Amino acid sequence: MRSTFRSVVFMFVFLNLLTFVAAQGLPAGTGGDIEGILRRGKLVVAITAVDQPPFYFVDKNGKLTGYDIDLASKMADELGVKLEITRDAPAFNDLVVLVASGRADMAVSKLSRTLSRAKTVKFSTPYMTFKQGLLFNRLQLAKVASEGEINSYVRDYKGTIGVIAKSSYANYAKTNFPYAQIKEFPTWEDAVRALTNGEVLSVYRDELEIKKVLASIPQSSLTLKPLYFTDLTDPIAIAVKSENSQLLYWVNIFLENQKKMTADEILANYAN
């Protein structure tokens, strides 16, 4: 009986010791949930190393600006802390790693909310939703489909599609166009260059990015053809560490009070 009692006491002490040691392993002020952010006095927000105007970009005066930067600044102000931007993520998928590892409190970086990423981090409600779209090389498209055949051609698309490597659209392409030949490029600019050079038949991204390309190329209607999907959308959301439920709850309430903008409104208000 005495032996059993000693065993129970030992187990109780051991479990409490484990809890204490685990707690000591998290230095004060480094947590990404609200308490840790307030204690630290700053909100660490991750964006990619490559500019994504109009969401975040360095303007002609050398200032980091854009829609996502303004959104992050408002959140820091509401929390009463300073904003720190980290650009250690080379690609969009790398943002998820930064947040999951605790090196950033959140990612506010035109980040698509996908099932694969949601295995690692938690996402807010979308603060923006775009239509997905294909942008075709019009000359190359005319060789495989007439104007009236384009919709049926796309439903069973077997052509080449250019996407950004390690992006949500690399995954979307595999799911939505299983018979297509998918070519990954380091940047969107590289993909668009391949499109205009005729190296790929189309590029795949959201409506905002496609509209930016069309606006940047003189007489683009003669060389390029956009196709937007009403049934395929791209929800843009904020990612936080899976354990930080209170922070996620706060972010969702914050977003409820923000005006949702369309792709055209963002382009008009944040012209690079």
Features from the language model and the residues they span:
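Alpha-to-beta junction loops
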Residues: 43-44, 80-82, 100-109, 159-160, ...
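Extracytoplasmic small-molecule ligand-binding "clamshell" domains
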Residues: 25-110, 119
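Flexible hinge/capping segments at coil-to-helix
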Residues: 125, 138-160
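Hydrophobic residues within well-ordered alpha-helices
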Residues: 75, 98-100, 154, 195-196, ...
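A ligand-binding cleft/hinge motif common to bilobed small-molecule-binding domains
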Residues: 93-94, 110-119, 171-175, 196-197, ...
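Short beta-strand-to-loop elements that line the ligand-binding cleft
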Residues: 82-91, 163, 180-187
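Ligand-binding clefts/hinges and TM-proximal coupling segments of bilobed small-molecule sensing domains
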Residues: 24-28, 164-177, 223-224, 252-272
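Periplasmic-binding protein-like
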Residues: 49, 128-136, 140-141, 207-256, ...
